[in-house]
Design a protein with these regions (language model features):
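N-terminal helix-turn-helix DNA-binding module of bacterial transcription factors
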Residues: 1-17
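Short, well-ordered beta-strand segments
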Residues: 14, 22-24, 79, 141, ...
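Alpha-helical recognition/docking segments in bacterial nutrient-uptake
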Residues: 16-130, 134, 193-194
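Hinge/beta->alpha junction and helix N-cap segments in small-molecule ligand-binding domains
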Residues: 25-35, 53-62, 105, 116-127, ...
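Short acidic/polar active-site loop segments enriched in Thr and Asp
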Residues: 76, 138-140, 198-200
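Flexible loop/turn connectors
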Residues: 170, 190-303
Length: 303
């Protein structure tokens, strides 16, 4: 109401470039993208740029207001990692002519207009499901929070393909919708255990969910991995400290930050030559520990 603007905004308007880039991601993914900061800043710092980390709400009205506020600033570029990319987002970015790189795969994004760097979530899901099958598990539940159709489709695609290859059960009851948190995983696991409907194995879309499943199993006297296999996703620091140690997916988040930043600066610093938008797909790694029945040395890493 008093026309206050942060100092960096005022100063930026005094030069042709603000030396600011924004990294936009969903609030729910705050922990997931925490490691990307080092990757982005390692490249941005070399070029004298500052990275603004902008968590965006899921609720549509707040989301729209936050995005408008951010793009009203003088940005030299942005990296987009929100769970969704709507036509109105594209229109807003085009109107402001902000160079943009996508850090997720979006079906809605024009492939001929934006550079894209993303992690192959379908491959991650496929590899983990294959590992669970190789450990002798057939009924493998997939636990995730149904908040992003794009992520859900990729996650389910890999799981379903691996099960189909082995003619393993793929019924809808094995798709377990739960909040992406320890409390969410715990509540869903308790519900399944109380009802006698727990699958042989549960592959969770986050380590936090998996920790909740482990807690529920412990309270109910269910032995992991002898009676229930549990797998996570994201290789959080606690995954090697819980009991049993958690088998999970190691995602190249730091590398994602480096490549996305390099792509963005290629656009920002383009001297006028035609640059064809490119796509870089980063592959995950499987970090095998004890929670799914593995008896090999802990931390064996498979490409």
């Amino acid at each position: 109401r008093v026309n206050y603007a942060p100092a960096w905004t005022v100063e930026s308007r005094m030069s042709s470039r603000s030396r600011l880039i924004a990294f936009l991601f969903s609030e729910a993914d705050y922990y997931f993208y925490s490691d990307i900061r080092s990757g982005l800043e390692s490249i941005a710092g070399l070029r004298g740029y500052t990275v603004l980390f902008c968590p965006i709400a899921a609720e549509q009205q707040r989301r729209s207001q936050q995005l408008r506020t951010i793009f009203e600033q003088k940005l030299d570029g942005a990296i987009w990692a929100l769970r969704d990319f709507y036509p109105e987002d594209i229109k807003m970015i085009d109107e402001r002519q902000v160079p943009l790189v996508l850090a997720r795969k979006y079906d809605s994004a024009p492939t001929d207009r934006y550079n894209c760097c993303y992690i192959n979530f379908a491959e991650a899901s496929y590899r983990m499901t294959r590992h669970l099958l190789e450990m002798g598990h057939r009924r493998i539940g997939l636990m995730f929070e149904n908040v992003s159709q794009q992520f859900m489709n990729s996650f389910c695609q890999g799981w379903e393909l691996a099960l189909k290859e082995e003619a393993a059960p793929r019924e809808a009851s094995l798709l377990l919708n739960a909040p992406n948190s320890m409390a969410g995983g715990y509540a869903k696991a308790m519900e399944l255990l109380d009802a006698g409907e727990m699958p042989e194995a549960v592959f969770c879309a986050s380590d936090e969910q998996a920790f909740g499943v482990l807690k529920a199993a412990h309270e109910k006297g269910v032995r992991v991995p002898e009676e229930l296999a549990v797998a996570g996703f994201t290789d959080s620091p606690m995954s090697n400290l819980c009991d049993p140690e958690l088998t999970t997916i190691d995602l190249p988040i730091y590398r994602l930050g480096i490549i996305a930043a390099r792509m963005l600066f290629d656009v920002i610093e383009d001297t006028g030559s035609e640059v064809t938008p490119g796509e870089v797909v980063l592959q995950p790694k499987l970090r095998i520990r004890r929670s799914c029945g593995n008896e090999k040395p802990i931390n064996v890493l498979f490409e």
